């Protein structure tokens, strides 16, 4: 399931963050890639301990935990702290898949990467290329979103970033460990939750059918969830 989550960051905060990141010190992105990914990765990355990066990352996490759409779609149990990348003209990232386990800096307990997230910070009209292309059984999905918007997708998906041909593309990227690791089960719960919300609006929260469906949702979550 691919999920577009609009306005994770307010427009003014996204603009402020972009200006701050443009003035930060960046390193070669290949330094943080695995052996296979390093062969196809051409970008810059903000060091994980960058003060401005940590500040913006914390705001992203706070914003997400206030968003019902994210909570319903991801069912998050752990979030790998957001990182930041920068693609200048000629930069891109070839086809690859994300590592199954990621270790936050200074932690020995890994995060299982059930979901990948990209939050765009550069307005789409300021650069050409730089599209996130995600492959699944339905084909290729090309993603280029407004500043402050985010896409959520299964971390096991093959994906790439097309070469930037004008301007630059700055974005946050990170991973989520979900209560429900199976993407199909998580998608069913997301659709069921949406149907319950629609029914509650139409019939009322206390309507018998709404209560019954809510019980089905929680019983499925109880069956499928693992902390």
Curated annotation (Swiss-Prot):
Keywords: Dioxygenase, Iron, Metal-binding, Oxidoreductase, Vitamin C
Positions bound to Fe cation: 96, 98, 159
InterPro entries referenced in this protein's UniProt entry, alphabetically: Oxoglu/Fe-dep_dioxygenase_dom (IPR005123), PKHD_C (IPR041097), PKHD_hydroxylase (IPR023550), Pro_4_hyd_alph (IPR006620), Pro_4_hyd_alph_FE2OG_OXY (IPR044862), RmlC_Cupin_sf (IPR011051)
The protein's Enzyme Commission number: 1.14.11.-
Cofactor or coenzyme needed: Fe(2+); L-ascorbate
Cofactor info, note text: Binds 1 Fe(2+) ion per subunit.
Stored PANTHER family: PKHD-TYPE HYDROXYLASE YBIX
Name used for this protein in its record: PKHD-type hydroxylase BAV1196
Organism annotation: Bordetella avium (strain 197N)
């Amino acid at each position: 399931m691919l999920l577009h989550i609009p306005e994770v960051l307010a427009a003014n905060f996204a603009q402020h963050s972009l200006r701050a990141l443009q003035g930060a010190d960046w390193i070669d992105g290949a330094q943080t890639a695995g052996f296979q990914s390093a062969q196809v990765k051409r970008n810059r990355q903000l060091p994980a301990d960058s003060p401005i990066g940590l500040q913006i990352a914390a705001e992203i996490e706070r914003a997400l935990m206030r968003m019902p759409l994210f909570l319903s779609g991801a069912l998050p149990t752990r979030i790998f702290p957001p990182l930041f990348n920068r693609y200048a003209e000629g930069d891109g990232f070839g086809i690859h898949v994300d590592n199954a386990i990621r270790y936050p800096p200074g932690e020995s307990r890994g995060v299982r990467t059930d979901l990948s997230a990209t939050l765009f910070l550069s307005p789409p009209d300021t650069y050409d290329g730089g599209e996130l292309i995600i492959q699944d059984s339905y084909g290729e999905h090309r993603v280029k979103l407004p500043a402050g918007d985010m896409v959520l997708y299964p971390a096991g998906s093959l994906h790439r970033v097309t070469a930037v041909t004008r301007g630059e593309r700055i974005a946050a990227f990170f991973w989520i460990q979900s209560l429900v690791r199976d993407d199909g089960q998580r998608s069913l719960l997301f659709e069921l939750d949406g149907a319950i919300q629609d029914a509650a609006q139409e019939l009322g929260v206390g309507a018998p059918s709404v209560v019954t469906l809510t019980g089905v949702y929680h019983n499925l979550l109880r069956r499928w969830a693992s902390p």
